[in-house]
Amino acid sequence: MATKKAGGSSRNGRDSAGRRLGVKKSDGQYVIPGNIIVRQRGTTIHPGTNVGLGKDHTIFALIEGRVEFLTKRNHKIVNVKEITNA
């Protein structure tokens, strides 16, 4: 009698669904308060002006305006610039 179970594939075949992370609004795009700009694990992109940071590190808009991505001292930062009607 064999004491080792044959290496079949019956115990395989499970996988988790993707988490739908990433940038949701790109540079220059119009946002309203509450719009999600970035979904991420950890602060890969840091919050700047007029954006909030959720407990799961989601960055969202606090005001109406345009999204702006920039790099300062090797940190990616996202801001929302207010639209001025001139």
Curated annotation (Swiss-Prot):
What keywords appear on the UniProt entry? Answer: Ribonucleoprotein, Ribosomal protein
* Stored InterPro entries: Ribosomal_bL27 (IPR001684), Ribosomal_bL27_CS (IPR018261)
Q: Does the keyword Membrane apply?
A: no
Q: Which cysteines are joined by disulfide bonds?
A: none
**What cellular component terms from Gene Ontology apply here?**
ribonucleoprotein complex; ribosome
The highest taxon in the source lineage is: Bacteria
Instruction: Output one GO BP term.
Output: translation
Q: Name one GO molecular function term.
A: structural constituent of ribosome
Q: Where is this region: Disordered?
A: 1-26
- Keyword set includes Ribonucleoprotein: yes
The similarity annotation says: Belongs to the bacterial ribosomal protein bL27 family.
Identify the NCBIfam families for this entry: L27 (TIGR00062)
This protein is called Large ribosomal subunit protein bL27
Give the source species: Rickettsia akari (strain Hartford)
